[in-house]
Structure formats: C-alpha cells, structure tokens
Amino acid sequence: MTTVTEVVEGAATPDPSPPPAAADTAPEFVRTVDRRLVHRAAVNEVFVTDLRRDGDGFLAGAQLPLSHGYFGDHPRRPAAFDFLLLLESARQACTAAGHLYYGVSRDTVFLVNGFSVRITDQGALTAGTRPGELVLAGGAVRDEGKGGRLRGVRFDVTLSLAGRRAARIGIDTSTAAGEDYRKLRFLQRRSTPPVTEDLDTTAAGRPADAAAVGRRNPLNVVLGEPVREGGAVSAPVEPRWENRSLFDHSYDHVPAMVLVEAARQLAHLAGVPVTAPVTACTARFTRFVELDSSVTATARAARPGAGSPTPPCGLLVEFRQNGAVVAETELDFGPAAGEEGA
C-alpha cells in the first residue's frame, strides 16, 4: 500500500438516517448531512447539505459560509470563496459518497495519495450577500485487488456556483480498515505515533508574520520564520494544534490540507501577492508527515527560467522530513485583486 499523508478517521457508528434520494431534483441547502458521514467532529465544520445518487455518479450540495474563522480569513477584496473551501467541500462529498455508494465501509479510513484542483471560472467564486450554494457533480472508480478487495477510490468532481462551472477537483485515495491502518502506522514507525490532542499548544518557534502569508488571525499561520537562499525560500511547518478548523479531530500526522495551506503561505513569503488567487493546485503525498519530527517546506519556481513570482505564475513546494521528500505541491496563481485584465 502506498504510504500517504492524510488519514481521516472512519465513522464506525451506523448512520440512523435513510439513504439520500436519487438526483431527480437539484440538491437542497437546508440542513447539513450527518457529520459522521464526512468524518467531522464538529457540526459547524460540515458544509455538505445534500447527497444523491445520479446514475453511476453522485450529486451533492454544499453551503459555503460568508464568514469562517479559517476559510474566510483572507485579505482579498472583493471577498471570494477560497479554493481550499472548495477542496474541503469536495472531500466531504466524496467521503460520504464513498460510504454510501462505492462500498467503503464505515470503519475504513481514506488515505489521500494526491489531488488536483483547477479553477475554471474565478469570477464565479466572488461572494455575494448570501452563503454560496455549491453544486458538486461527481463520479468514482474503485481500485480493486484480488478477489475484489477494495484498495482505493479515485474521485472526479465538477463544482458549480450560481449555474457557473467554477472548478474541477480530482482526489486519489487508498483505503484501509481501521485496525489495518493502526498496524501500518506502527510497522512504519516501530512505535505508536503521537496524536495532535496530546501535543503542546505552545508555538514551537517564532511564527511567520500573519499579514505576510495572507492571514489576519495568527492562529491560521502554519509556518515558522522563513529562510531565503539563492532563488529558494524555506520555512518549517509549524501549525497551531489548537486550530479546530485544521484539526477538527485528533490526527497522528500532519494532514494534507495543512500542507497545502503551508505551500500557499510559503508562496506568499516567496513574493506572490497575498491577494493573488490560486488558480490550480496539484499535490502528491508519498509518506506520512510525522508529528514528532521537524518538516521543512521549500518553494522554487515551478518552471525552469521563470522570473520573479508575479502572477500569473507557478511555484513548486517540496516538503522534507528526516532527509526524505514526503510531499510535493505545485500552485498556480492568477492576477492579484485589482490587477485583473491589467
């Protein structure tokens, strides 16, 4: 099995609600789905409001909040829904669909091998005066081994807002039963991994400046002070474990979403304006990022010969821990707010 970065705790408790209806009508946005279906501990961190079968695929709805302590903590004006909010909504919809439609048992954990995000209409993400009503049309392919044993699921989702196709997201996962996952982690480390809820919430070092990484709330800063050498910028990944949007439940590793946030923040430290939106993101996770060992992110121009990081541009961010590459993320940015069409 591929070693990966993110694991979301399985929801072994049966869902008391009946299976969602078929997609003969548009998804509804009146209540959230059972939080256990999307592997969230807090109801207020659930964005999916509806999930229906749609032929061989599925159709979901998600309500995007106008204000959120993490996803809404950005200086871009006019305000826009963040690409990581779209990714989290897609993750939740795919997780629930996996359990309901694609044979993933409730005691199974998803391990994210990689994902891709492409924003196809940046204007569609501009926030209005009401919460966004995101429609997610998705499909999935099961990866099976001998005897039909499930090894993983690959999801592909198209996301639309107000009738405009806004983004396309692909998520590649492996799967493991809960006990198999615990055995895997022990064998890899030769020890039981620590968990986030037991970690000291005191900052490991001096954090990066919040404004410099596009944040107002210091709790949302996930990097330490940067180091610049040649054409590269590096910084330690040091998230705040008490941030309940990033760590909704207890983890035994640094989750993928935190690494992608670290990559974006490092891009801003490398010179990308904090009001420049992410237009595309691809990520690959090759190892678990352990909690009890330092990890460093390094940003370089994604394409040889690229000049200063002035959007539109691309940056490659590499994560290293104990001398090995554990993850890679490539981010593309569009023009900063106020520079569109310039």
What are these regions (language model features)?
Residues 96-140, 264-302:
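Hydrophobic beta-strand-centered segment that forms part of the acyl-chain substrate-binding groove
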Residues 218-287, 291-296, 316:
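Acidic/His-leaning functional-site neighborhoods
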Residues 2-25, 135-203, 302-342:
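HotDog/MaoC-like acyl-thioester-processing domains
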Residues 3, 55-109, 233-269:
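Hot-dog-fold acyl-thioester-processing enzymes
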Residues 63-65, 118-120, 137, 174, ...:
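A structural detector for beta-sheet-dominated domains
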Residues 55-57, 129-133, 150-154, 166, ...:
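A general secondary-structure signal for short beta-strands and their flanking turns/coil
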Residues 1-78, 174-246, 342:
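Non-catalytic linker/capping segments at the edges of enzyme domains
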Residues 81, 85, 95, 99-111, ...:
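Extended intrinsically disordered, low-complexity coil regions enriched in Ser, Thr, Gly, Ala
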